[in-house]
Design a protein with these regions (language model features):
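Extracellular, repeat-based ectodomains that mediate carbohydrate processing or recognition
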Residues: 1-171
């Protein structure tokens, strides 16, 4: 058993649709999780990441969602081990005024700009839903995501499908 970090609850592991752990045989393991920061005990929605070449020693990265559009309300994180970069993707529970919709589901992602183990996750994180420019997001209220990596010719493509929690049939 390897202790990597702390989480107040296991939102990344609560659903069979998320992929909190991803492996690239040439790079290693990348993990995404809902992180608990002891010096900020009121919030449990920080997004963290961990990297390991061998699955035994992990380096952790904290607070990936502290800048807009992140609101430190991350849910359902997933990791995608791309050929060159590790990606961390999650749903941010946002207020309706920041584009997530009535129930606040806004898919967001970041990646380690310095490759695996580089420790420089892109900030601010970016919208995965390209319908968020301009706000509000269209479609809104995207919550639990299922992600995978495929290739178009030789270029990696991240595929994502989200459940939509909307109170309106029109949405």
């Amino acid at each position: 058993i390897v202790l990597i970090d702390s989480s107040l609850n296991g939102y990344g592991l609560v659903s069979g649709y998320t992929t909190p752990l991803s492996y690239n045989p040439n790079q290693g393991f990348i993990m995404a999780y809902r992180q608990w920061i002891p010096d900020d005990p009121e919030k449990s929605g920080y997004i963290g990441s961990a990297f390991s070449e061998d699955g035994e020693k992990f380096v952790t990265y904290s607070r990936l969602n502290v800048e807009d559009p992140g609101e430190v309300m991350g849910r359902y994180p997933s990791a995608v081990a791309g050929p060159a970069y590790p990606y961390i993707i999650w749903n941010e529970y946002t207020s309706p005024s920041t584009g997530g919709g009535q129930y606040g589901g806004r898919p967001i992602y970041t990646w380690d700009e310095f490759y695996y183990g580089g420790g420089s996750f892109f900030s601010p994180p970016l919208d995965l839903n390209n319908g968020c420019n301009p706000l509000p997001c269209d479609p809104p209220d995207n919550w639990v995501g299922s992600l995978s990596l495929s290739y178009k010719e030789q270029n990696p493509v991240i595929n994502a499908i989200y459940s939509q929690w909307s109170g309106s049939i029109a949405e």
